[in-house]
Amino acid sequence: MHRSKPKNSEGGIIDSHDEEISDLSLRWHKPLSKNNVQMPALKILRYKKIRSNYSKLENILMIGFETTKYPRYFLVLPISGQTLYQENYIKMFYKNLNTNLKKYFLFKHYPKSVMSNGFNIDDRIRSLLPDKQLISNYKKAIKKAKVVICNYPSTTFLEAMISGPTILLYKPEFWKFTSDFDNLINKLKRANILFDNPAAAAKHLNKVWDNVNIWWESKEVQSVRNQFFSEACDSREKYLDIWKNFLISQENEYFQKKRDKEA
């Protein structure tokens, strides 16, 4: 029996390889097939309290992504030069920020140690930002971010969402989700968490900046956040018990089948 490892599948981005080869496929998101099992996202939960004091923080942290210059895989995300749209998105977002907020803007580029042959998005915006606003230490920066702007719907977006005020700024045609998440995506848009227009995202941030908590803690946004963590990233409190009970049940099932064969 094959059990694939837990995956976020970028919150439901189309990917059925594990389901096709596995008896069970462990996922952070809600089950999308009969062999899916939703399990708590241990990697994400450790970020839950790192921005609990977000209203007292002052930075705007934008997090970018990279892809290789030449395609290596068939993926449902930006491939090769498609990633360059980010440059325009970053510049447009920054241009539409209120002048008094621009000094708080930081850009976290994708680690070159991981993607050494990418398009170096950070180098492409050096004319826009001084070096002190181009940062490399993600964990240090997110702890000081009042709002995080994530340019891609992957693990980093989940970490930002669970920790405090977050905006996802992405290009829908390059990030394909299953229709199972249409309702959630529409609600994220209405709650001003998800944007595909950089200028609109910046204008929203300008509007809520002085009282971010009024937006983030509003009834509508809290409802959408709860739905998000129910459907896209399991964040149940008793995560260790859930994992323990699941593993014990699988072990018991394995040995029971073994005993049945030997009987």
Predicted regions and their residues:
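Structural alpha-helical scaffold elements that stabilize or flank donor/cofactor-binding regions
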Residues: 18, 140-142, 187
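Conserved catalytic-core segment of nucleotide-activated headgroup transferases in glycan assembly
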Residues: 42-127
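Short acidic alpha-helix that forms the nucleotide-activated donor recognition element
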Residues: 135-145, 162
